Each structure stands twice: as structure tokens, then as C-alpha cells.
Amino acid sequence: MKYTSSSKAGTGKTNEDAILVIQPSLEEIVAMVCDGMGGLDFPEIASEIMATSVKDVFSAGIRDNVPEQIHSAFALATEELTKESARRGARLGCAVGIVVIKAKVMWYSSIGNVRIYLTESDITKRLLTQDDVYTDEKGVSYLTNCIKGNGSIPDIQVMKLTLPEHYIVETCSDGYYESNPIDDSSIVSILQTD
């Protein structure tokens, strides 16, 4: 299993995205894209806190109960964001997509508008996640679910699927899939071709 990753800032601003990839073995990987919420305070700090929390939970490896491990990481991120929000007197939050692969099994979760795609050997690319977004009558979009520093752990659904023999899994921020040069753009691609 191989991976590539890329993250770049939008035009004239700080990169508010963070990428984390942990590969404990050739058959295991944890990959995540965090997209700090630009409408809140310190989005780049929010996404880094999320990435650090996941790293802390998964640094000892992928356990047998992966959904519980993902929930623990998101709970830790909420706790850390809440502390940082209080310390700064600010509002922090981020959208996040996480993929955990162990052998031929994948667990994934997305909160906000970070997307996860699966391309199988027949080149059919399908979206595995739904955006947690509400668009008002003026066309302004708002996240309806995200990791934020208010002490409230969001509703987290962890999905599981068996992977085909050959696949590509992509986790990407809205700046990537909307191809907007103004927004930050981040992607992690995991490839299994052997």
C-alpha cells in the first residue's frame, strides 16, 4: 500500500488545512485531512489540534476496535479544542475526514465537508461520505456538523467496508474537490495496486 499527499494554501493566505498519515506497516494506514473553519478563529490551529489528537490516539498502532479508537480521537480533539478556545477566548472548529485501513478492511468517518472517495479497479469513482452542509436562501453555506471547541462531541458515524483487490482511496478538503484556487487544497491518496 502506497500513499501520496498534498496540501497548499489558497491564494494569499495561511493554509488552514492539516494532513496526517501514519503507516505502522505495509498493510496498515491512518490517513486524515482536517479543514479548519475559516469563518471561526484560528482555523490553522484548529486543524493542527485535530491532527495532533488523532496522532496521539493512533501512535501506538491500530487496535482491534477501530471505531472506538476513532471516537476516542475525536473526543480528545474536542477536549483540546475546548481548552484552546477558552485559553484564547476564541471559537475554533474544523471539518475532518479519516480513513483507517488494516489489511483489506477500511473504516472511515467524515464530519463537515471533507470527502472520502473510493475508486475500484474498474475505474468507478464513488463518493462514500455526505457533506454536513446547509445552504441558506442567500447561497451561504454552513457546516451542520464539525469538531469544535464548545465541549460538545459531535455525532460521529464510523463506516466499515471490505476493500477490493485494487483500489484508490482519496480523502480531500472542499478546496480540492471544488477546484477553487482561493481556498486551501488538501488531499491524501492511498493506492493498492499489487
Label the model's feature ranges.
Residues 1-194:
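PP2C/PPM-type serine/threonine phosphatase catalytic domain
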